[in-house]
Each structure stands twice: as structure tokens, then as C-alpha cells.
């Protein structure tokens, strides 16, 4: 598509692997034609670990396999920000870590890992407020913490992406947009995820409005969709049972066609902004969960990831957004003769 806005396709590779081994993940993504992936859970021979728990030898092995399969990391799929704001028993299993300790240990570790995997992007979240409380009451506290996280990332020449997700303070587009406005830091951008909104009981129109609220602060987008007659009470707590009804981007209630058609107008300026921070382009990061989702991840299998990719590509083709999947020119370049 000449002169069409272009995105870089990526995805959470752990969703494509039945056993989350590095070879499974990378073989699936290479076969799908993807050249980027977000790293989250991975097994390098010592069991499944979150990226935050990888040892230096494991990191080195992942890097070797990335080179073998010609993959790059789009973002570090960290769980930064998925802890409680306060040490309050609210009936959930969410853990609490004193913030100064969290900043000096976990956030700095995430920055070190981002550099180890040569990515400029760290995915993160907006902290858990006590269950059944009003998230707006905690915006000021979250802004203070996220401002400090953004500054740590900035000093490491990295960018922190804040994802909209249920049960967190930034659970809606309006909340996340206000947090972004108050933090007002060049190293913090927003990540829209339509399914994370619509599974909270919001309508298609309301989901689009939440995307529009976040649009000026966007850094990249996660792609998954949701279709079920049983969503949660609007804006209420989302439990694990609800997280079983995800579908490809061309089949759900989130209207990715409308979202991506609008986003196409934003891509050129956003790409220029991201490149100034050393980021190669605008990522669409697939996290389809088509075989089930959960609080810290989801699963699609190699077949489900393929179905999700083809569904996304159909939408992109329809709205006029360009992308690249590996072709024979890439194969010729890789074979070295």
C-alpha cells in the first residue's frame, strides 16, 4: 500500500507456545512471518519464568535463540505496576511492596532487562486500588508513583507504556488519560487495549470513546477483542471467569475497524515522535487470549495466534494500514547466499 501509514506487527510470543519454551515461541513467530515479539513468560530449560526472573545465562540463551530465529524484542512485557497501592486486605491475592523498595529493585531490574534485550519499551500498569473503592480517589497517589517510574525509565533512555486494564486505578481510558495528563513526562505513554475495556461491560461506542480519550497519549496498541453476553457489571471488578471470551480482532464487540481507521490518521505523527526516542516505529502488539486469559497473561496456541494474526491483517487491509510479514526477500537475506 504505497503512502499508507505503516505499523510494526508484534505479539506476546508466550501465547503461541503450548509449553512456553523459547524454541516453541520463536519458531511459531518466525513461521507466522513476525519479526518482533514482546517477552513475558519463557522457558529456557529451567522451567517457565517471568522475564523479570531470568538469570544472566538464561538471558544470553534467549538472545542466541533470537538471533537464530531473527527476532527482535518490541517491548518488555513486565508486570511493573501490578501491585497494591497500600498494604490493605481487600480479599484479593494482589501483593504489596513498599514503593521505594519497588522502585529501586523491580523498576531498575526492568530497565536492565530492557537494555539486555535491546528494546526501548517497557509495558506496565497503574497499581491496584483496594477492591470496591473508587479509582478516582487514588489518581494523585498513582500519578506520584508513575512519575517516579517514568523518570527512572527516562534516565535509562527508555519509555514506559501504561496499559489500560480492569481492576487497576487506570481501568478506563478516561482515568488513564487523566493520569497521563498529570504525570506529563516524555518517558510515559499509554497503551490502549480494546478488550480490556469492553470486558468491563462497556459498549462498543463507549470503548471507542475511551480510545479517543487516550489517543493523544498513545505509544502503541495491544490487539485483542472480546465477545460475550456475560460481561461484568459496568466498571466493576472483573474476575477470571469473565476472561474466557476473547476473540480475534475481526470478530468482537470492540469495533477494531473503527479504532484502527481512526488510528491510521495518528500513525505518521506518532511514528516521528517515537523515532525521536529511538523506537523503530508504531507497534501493534497482539495479545489475543483466544484460548483463555488471566490476570498475568493468556494463551492462544500456535493455531490461535495464527487465526488472530490473520484476523488483524484483514482489518488492517480494510482500513488501509500497511505492515510487513516475512517474505522471500527476507528468506534470501537470511540464507546468506
Task: Go through each PLM region and give its residues.
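Alpha-helix-loop-beta-strand connector modules within alpha/beta enzyme cores
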Residues: 56-78, 143-156, 182-183, 255-263
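N-terminal substrate-binding region of glycoside hydrolase catalytic domains
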Residues: 12-14, 28, 32-56, 77
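Short beta-strand segments at enzyme active-site cores
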Residues: 38-39, 73-78, 119-126, 158-163, ...
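Active-site acidic/histidine proton-transfer and metal-coordination neighborhood
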Residues: 23, 28, 68, 84-190, ...
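Aromatic- and glycine-enriched glycan-recognition loops and surfaces
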Residues: 18-23, 50-64, 102
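Active-site beta-loop-alpha junctions enriched in small/polar residues
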Residues: 12-16, 40-44, 78-81, 127-129, ...
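Histidine-acidic metal/acid-base catalytic patches
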Residues: 2-10, 19-35, 67, 173-337
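Surface-exposed, active-site-proximal loop segments in enzymatic domains
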Residues: 43-56, 80-104, 126-139, 236-247, ...
